[in-house]
């Protein structure tokens, strides 16, 4: 039994059900969908926005403090040029691109899953408070990086339509 759960994608679901009824192998289209969503998620990281275009919360002072060392300040403790450049160029969720590069998909004949295997990925996506997670150095705001934008939905629907035509 194949279960399809694509919230808000009624037309897309109808296309997928037509493919299933025709006995078609869905793994190629699910692979194309996964590839698209990985690329779209990478764009979310590069633009520091959620799939719906909402800007992510800015980095906190704790984030900046954790990335700065003695070579980033002058003798009075103020940021030097190197430290100021680090702070100015630091995007949320991007320190060394590890989380972004961990985004992958797994396609099968019954569906596609997009996500990360990084343990901290859920915390970065959903956020968390020090009250709920005492080991945190402070509250972490939600920065949604996974999900489909309206543009993604259009592309995913087109991928399915094209698969139906082939």
Which residue ranges define each predicted feature?
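Short, Lys/Arg-rich flexible segments
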Residues: 1-166
């Amino acid at each position: 039994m194949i279960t399809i759960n694509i919230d808000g994608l009624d037309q897309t679901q109808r296309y997928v059900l037509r493919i299933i009824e025709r006995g078609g192998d869905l793994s190629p289209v699910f692979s194309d969908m996964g590839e698209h969503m990985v690329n779209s998620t990478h764009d979310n990281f590069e633009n520091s926005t959620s799939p719906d275009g909402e800007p992510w919360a800015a980095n906190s002072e704790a984030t900046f403090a954790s990335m700065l060392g003695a070579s980033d300040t002058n003798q009075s403790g103020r940021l030097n040029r190197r430290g100021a450049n680090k702070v100015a160029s630091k995007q949320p969720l991007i320190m060394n691109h590890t989380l972004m590069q961990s985004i992958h998909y797994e396609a099968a004949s019954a569906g596609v899953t997009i996500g990360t295997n990084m343990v901290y990925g859920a915390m970065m996506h959903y956020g968390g408070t020090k009250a709920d997670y005492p080991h945190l150095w402070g509250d972490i705001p939600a920065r949604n990086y996974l999900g489909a934008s309206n543009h993604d939905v259009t592309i995913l629907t087109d991928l399915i339509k094209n698969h139906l035509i082939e």
